[in-house]
Amino acid sequence: MNKELLNCERVWLNVTPATLRSDLADYGLLEPHALGVHEGRIHALVPMQDLKGPYPAHWQDMKGKLVTPGLIDCHTHLIFAGSRAEEFELRQKGVPYAEIARKGGGIISTVRATRAACEEQLFELALPRVKSLIREGVTTVEIKSGYGLTLEDELKMLRVARRLGEALPIRVKTTLLAAHAVPPEYRDDPDSWVETICQEIIPAAAEAGLADAVDVFCEHIGFSLAQTEQVYLAADQYGLAVKGHMDQLSNLGGSTLAANFGALSVDHLEYLDPEGIQALAHRGVVATLLPTAFYFLKETKLPPVAALRKAGVPMAVSSDINPGTAPIVSLRMAMNMACTLFGLTPVEAMAGVTRHAARALGEQEQLGQLRVGMLADFLVWNCGHPAELSYLIGVDQLVSRVINGEETLHG
């Protein structure tokens, strides 16, 4: 028996690894291997043909089943209260969003409901959403604030996100998105809201250890380039990574700004220009594609996938779960839409929810690949090829999931 395997607490024999390793082509598929875990990390990955008994005490034969890294949903807004179903109905009848917003709908309706909910209520509302992702194979999820838009309500959302990670078998990364919209109280003075974010909310979130990163919605209906820079400077002062909702509805130059700040990722990108693409490529910033929002809003302007591919920009894929523009709680569906709507290959979609999604969260040294030394987050699938994970939607193919070396039986 291989010495490294003998040192493992658990060994999975006869797995077919789709490693998603950056140094291997396509899915990084290997012949049947034994995968050993020690102290929460992948400790050994050994070809079956090189093994001789005896096997360690805790082993199981997976009979050739496909194993992939755990899926990573790197952009969600899944903590919220209230429903926008009536708004959806009105929009299908042709009522413009501006009119809906004037009547109290839109994002501010979610803000009102989220402010009114206590932490326990928000936790209970978010619980089934996260459990749905877990059932699909998500082992890491990013959760943003952004529906509180006061100091206490933004922190409340972040506390709920942390609690979800403690209560469920999933790793949660948190992002402060106080610069999501201008709250009603600051409608006539948005610069004062930006000052509040920079001088009060970011310091409080950082000091409480509630935020892993800071995000800004940089758009003509959101925050200007100058305001975005202010928020990024404040985040940098507190040692927080930055991200950006960029170039979804127009191009303000936000992606270039974010790249200059060394952002982890810029997200949406339908209006990304060549200058922005080169900036992302130069700084190694991840382009996160959100096809569910594109689909739900019936957009027609596609993100420049071919240009991103040519420039070598890593492309992540995420669900963008939110009540207004992407009420679709399915990373697997986002993978499918990334292929069918945006033209990604299934290999790119799979890399987009593993290796590149890990980079979008700053976790590329720990997550997103099956590689010795990385955290033991992986999935066992009842399917013959990893392309099925982007192709066949709505069928439960997950056999089991492992996070930090601990197996969670599926179901």
Swiss-Prot record:
User: What reaction is this protein's catalytic activity?
Assistant: 4-imidazolone-5-propanoate + H2O = N-formimidoyl-L-glutamate
GO cellular component assignments: cytoplasm
Pathway of action = Amino-acid degradation; L-histidine degradation into L-glutamate; N-formimidoyl-L-glutamate from L-histidine: step 3/3
Q: Which UniProt keywords apply?
A: Cytoplasm, Histidine metabolism, Hydrolase, Iron, Metal-binding, Zinc
Major place of localization?
cytoplasm
Which GO BP terms, alphabetically? L-histidine catabolic process to glutamate and formamide; L-histidine catabolic process to glutamate and formate
User: In which domain of life is the source organism classified?
Assistant: Bacteria
Q: Where does Zn(2+) bind?
A: 75, 77, 245, 320
* Necessary cofactors: Zn(2+); Fe(3+)
Q: Where does N-formimidoyl-L-glutamate bind?
A: 147, 322, 324
GO molecular function annotation: imidazolonepropionase activity; iron ion binding; zinc ion binding
**Pfam (any one):** Amidohydro_1
Q: Does the keyword Cell inner membrane apply?
A: no
Q: Which residues take part in binding 4-imidazolone-5-propanoate?
A: 84, 147, 180, 248, 325
Cofactor detail note: Binds 1 zinc or iron ion per subunit.
Q: What is its EC number?
A: 3.5.2.7
Q: Which InterPro entries match?
A: Amidohydro-rel (IPR006680), HutI (IPR005920), Metal-dep_hydrolase_composite (IPR011059), Metal_Hydrolase (IPR032466)
**The family this protein is said to belong to:** Belongs to the metallo-dependent hydrolases superfamily. HutI family.
Q: What does this protein do?
A: Catalyzes the hydrolytic cleavage of the carbon-nitrogen bond in imidazolone-5-propanoate to yield N-formimidoyl-L-glutamate. It is the third step in the universal histidine degradation pathway.
PANTHER family to which the protein is assigned, alphabetical: IMIDAZOLONEPROPIONASE (PTHR42752), IMIDAZOLONEPROPIONASE-RELATED (PTHR42752:SF1)
This one is known as Imidazolonepropionase
Source organism: Aeromonas hydrophila subsp. hydrophila (strain ATCC 7966 / DSM 30187 / BCRC 13018 / CCUG 14551 / JCM 1027 / KCTC 2358 / NCIMB 9240 / NCTC 8049)
